[in-house]
UniProtKB/Swiss-Prot annotation:
Localization (cell): Cytoplasm
Active site: D11, D130
Organism: Escherichia coli O9:H4 (strain HS)
Top enzyme category: lyase
Any one cellular-component term (Gene Ontology): cytoplasm
Phylogenetic placement of the source organism: Bacteria, Pseudomonadati, Pseudomonadota, Gammaproteobacteria, Enterobacterales
Keywords for this protein: Amino-acid biosynthesis, Cytoplasm, Histidine biosynthesis, Lyase
Coarse class of the protein's main subcellular location: cytoplasm
Example of a GO biological process term: L-histidine biosynthetic process
GO terms of molecular function: imidazoleglycerol-phosphate synthase activity; lyase activity
Catalytic activity: 5-[(5-phospho-1-deoxy-D-ribulos-1-ylimino)methylamino]-1-(5-phospho-beta-D-ribosyl)imidazole-4-carboxamide + L-glutamine = D-erythro-1-(imidazol-4-yl)glycerol 3-phosphate + 5-amino-1-(5-phospho-beta-D-ribosyl)imidazole-4-carboxamide + L-glutamate + H(+)
Gene that this polypeptide is encoded by: hisF
Protein name: Imidazole glycerol phosphate synthase subunit HisF
Pfam entry (one): His_biosynth
């Protein structure tokens, strides 16, 4: 059995790490490189960086900090933000990123997933999915351009259909960003994760809602996700990564202990 992964997420805007609640009202957390170094030293399995306004601004991720991160950490990291071409991806990977993640650009042009997978291999192509639960209809819908609340829009895709579509096109991993739970710290949406897991045949990463160590355990034990991504509990030092991993190990979760 592959070890489960603990993945801190760093949302980047204007060269700094920020964090919002349900993708809104972002506050500044701190500088990118020191935070990345701290999480690597605490035992994170990998890091994810989202340049959250790149797609809505019509630009690619700011590459200046990618190489600086690569110099100070020795764990894999993934970068996302406005990657719309093979050239964009090649530059980011050449600066030291191990994976690239696409979200809004994939919705705008689904063929991008296949072109990236064919060029760089499925192992480094992650598709992020921003999913919102509509209580009135009882359905999960995919959102686009979520980094800018004034431009966020609901797409025609229901979440489960999009999960299946991106796999057909070559996604090597899926990060499910559950917008209703984002930053609230009341736990992952286990029901949604279970539904997605049924149709997902590539590694599935849960994102949005972690508030306690038990929430991570539930995601691994009850929804059988491959990794759990979180931000605010790590940024605000509510949970220490090494302590989290020790706890998960005592609960029988296969996890890499530093």
């Amino acid at each position: 059995m592959l070890a489960k992964r603990i993945i801190p997420c760093l949302d980047v805007r204007d060269g700094q790490v920020v964090k919002g609640v349900q993708f809104r009202n972002h506050e500044i957390i701190g500088d990118i490189v020191p935070l990345a170094k701290r999480y690597a030293e605490e035992g994170a399995d990998e890091l994810v960086f989202y340049d959250i306004t790149a797609s809505s601004d019509g630009r690619v991720v700011d590459k200046s900090w990618v190489s600086r991160v690569a110099e100070v950490i020795d764990i894999p990291f993934c970068v996302a933000g406005g990657i719309k071409s093979l050239e964009d991806a090649a530059k980011i990977l050449s600066f030291g990123a191990d994976k690239i993640s696409i979200n809004s650009p994939a919705l705008a042009d689904p063929t991008l997933i296949t072109r990236l997978a064919d060029r760089f291999g499925v192992q480094c192509i992650v598709v992020g999915i921003d999913t919102w639960y509509d209580a009135e209809t009882g359905k999960y819908h995919v959102n686009q351009y979520t980094g800018d609340e004034s431009r966020t829009r609901v797409t025609q895709w229901e979440t489960l259909d999009w999960v299946e579509e991106v796999q057909k096109r070559g996604a090597g991993e899926i990060v499910l960003n559950m917008m209703n739970q984002d930053g609230v710290r009341n736990g992952y949406d286990l029901e949604q994760l279970k539904k997605v897991h049924e149709v997902c045949h590539v590694p599935l990463i849960a994102s949005g809602g972690a508030g306690t160590m038990e929430h991570f355990l539930e995601a691994f034990r009850d929804a059988d996700v491959d990794g759990a991504l979180a931000a605010s509990v790590f940024h605000k030092q509510i949970i220490n990564i090494s302590e989290l991993k020790a706890y998960l190990a005592t609960q029988g979760v296969e996890i890499r202990i530093c």
